Amino acid sequence: MSTPSQRTWQFESFYHTIINARDVDETIAFYELLGFEILDDRRSTVWPDDQGAFFGLIPDIKGRAALMRLPADPNGPMLDIIEWQVPRVDFPARSPEVVPRVLAFRVENVKAAFQELRALGVTFTKPQPNEMPEVGIVASAACEDPNGNLIEIIELEPGLRHSKIGTVYREDEG
């Protein structure tokens, strides 16, 4: 097996993630509230015959979809919102004992986003954003999208790539 320095290939960037949707239109509307825009509307696309095999699914898959992106990051990763019609997707009831899919987004001014989104009808998991200055988190909050995915919005201190939670809150190793 080759080592990364010997390879003639490399992963370049994170491209997209698929969000399974109960209702593609409702899901698009939710992500538009968060500031996403449609990059490629695929709600009336007829998928190629071999697409099911590519995903390891039945041959004749069907779905309505849209690629969405954040305007502030035009070349960044996209959300591929898909309402699968064939085969169908199960959406189990949400339980506090089962961790859902979590998508986290950096946000400038989480407190303002929280207030505006709440006024627009978005329900958050807590009545106010969390503040954890000891780990570099200015504010963070979480809500659910229409499909049960947990959406985290986080604002970090300027210059931080990630929070310092792994170094501040650590089990004693002795």
At which residue positions do the language-model features occur?
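Vicinal oxygen chelate
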Residues: 1-10, 13-22, 41-43, 53, 66-118, 139-144, 149, ...
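Short N-terminal helix-initiation segments at or just after the protein's N-terminus
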Residues: 4-19, 40-54, 85-93
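Short beta-strand segments enriched in hydrophobic/aromatic residues
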Residues: 21, 32, 85, 155-157
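A generic structural micro-feature
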Residues: 9, 57-62, 94-97
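Core segments of cupin and vicinal oxygen chelate
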Residues: 20-75, 119, 136, 168-169
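Intrinsically disordered, low-complexity regions enriched in small/polar residues
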Residues: 13-17, 32-33, 38, 56, ...
